[in-house]
Swiss-Prot record:
Gene Ontology molecular function, alphabetical: diaminopimelate epimerase activity
Subcellular compartments: Cytoplasm
Sorted UniProt keywords: Amino-acid biosynthesis, Cytoplasm, Isomerase, Lysine biosynthesis
The protein's name: Diaminopimelate epimerase
Binding site for substrate: N13, Q46, N64, G74, N75, N148, N181, E199, R200, G209, T210
One Pfam family in the UniProt entry: DAP_epimerase
GO CC terms, sorted: cytosol
Catalytic reaction(s) noted: (2S,6S)-2,6-diaminopimelate = meso-2,6-diaminopimelate
Taxonomic superkingdom: Bacteria
GO biological process: lysine biosynthetic process via diaminopimelate
Family affiliation: Belongs to the diaminopimelate epimerase family.
Residues marked Could be important to modulate the pK values of the two catalytic cysteine residues (site): H150, E199
Pathway of action: Amino-acid biosynthesis; L-lysine biosynthesis via DAP pathway; DL-2,6-diaminopimelate from LL-2,6-diaminopimelate: step 1/1
Length: 268
């Protein structure tokens, strides 16, 4: 019997979604990496494995293209919400996420952002609102954990930054013991941000939902914008709502591209 999957994307951030709630699927980092390979596998930024949960409607496991299992992915959560098709609670390594499908997408309620340096985590104590760091033109980053670790830099022109070169340097810097997602943003009108993201374990992406959340939170915290914030990514827009002491709410599109069949055994 063939193994089934669904190919989806959230603003160009693409996923192979495997529903293993009835028929279990053994997933290893090596197998996830092989499936995500765009030349020899199916190809995706992340592989999403849905499993039964004893405390939520479904458990969602997330594997980056390099095979590493990670805590959270906002775009994938919206995609899974549209597959479920009704309000639901999704269990992740980052905690419980509440989702509500909407026309062409979904709304996701994440937890509250975390700013403590040791919970980002960083390798040393530091003011996460204005970090005294510099990698070439990227200086004074803000660190936020929104279920996974992010550093945010505000610059005059996000498109002018050589993120393909600086991203991997910052991601793997010893300051970040669990590596980090790198966000470069610029103001793009009242309560609007332009954002590019180097995603940990993936690279440059068309969109990153948790990156949009982290960047909007950092911008609100710095007094640059007010909620709700429209975040423009290469793949499209997300709307982020947040106030201090409250959870983050993200809204945006999710697209089902096609359903397919394969044999997972061929991927190791």
């Amino acid at each position: 019997m063939a193994d089934r999957f669904t190919k989806m994307h959230g603003l160009g951030n693409d996923f192979v979604v495997i529903d293993a709630r009835v028929a279990p699927v053994e997933m290893t980092p090596a197998r996830a990496h092989a499936i995500a390979d765009r030349r020899h596998g199916i190809g995706c930024d992340q592989l999403i494995l849905l499993e039964p949960s004893t405390s939520a409607d479904v458990k969602m496991r997330i594997f980056n293209a390099d095979g590493g299992e990670v805590e959270a992915c906002g775009n994938a959560t919206r995609c899974v919400a549209t597959l479920i098709g009704k309000p639901a609670v999704i269990e992740t390594l980052a905690g419980m996420l509440r989702v509500t499908p909407a026309d062409g997408g979904a709304e996701v309620t994440l937890g509250e952002p975390v700013f403590d340096w040791d919970h980002i985590p960083l390798a040393m104590p530091m003011d996460t609102r204005d970090m005294p760091v510099a990698w070439d033109e990227l200086e004074h980053g803000a660190a936020v954990n929104v279920g996974n670790p992010h550093i945010v830099f505000f610059v005059p022109e996000a498109d002018a930054v050589a993120l393909d070169q600086l991203g991997p340097r910052i991601e793997t810097d010893p300051l970040f013991p669990e590596r980090v997602n790198v966000n470069v943003a610029s103001l793009d009108g009242e309560n609007q941000l332009q954002l590019r993201v180097w995603e940990r374990g993936v690279g440059l992406t068309q969109a990153c939902g948790t990156g949009a959340c982290a960047t909007a939170v950092a911008a609100i915290r710095a007094g640059l914008v007010r909620s709700p914030v429209t975040v423009a990514l290469p793949g499209g827009d997300l709307v982020i709502r947040w106030a201090p002491g409250e959870p983050i709410v993200m809204s945006g599109a999710a697209t089902r591209v096609f359903d397919g069949e394969t044999d997972w055994a061929q991927f190791g």
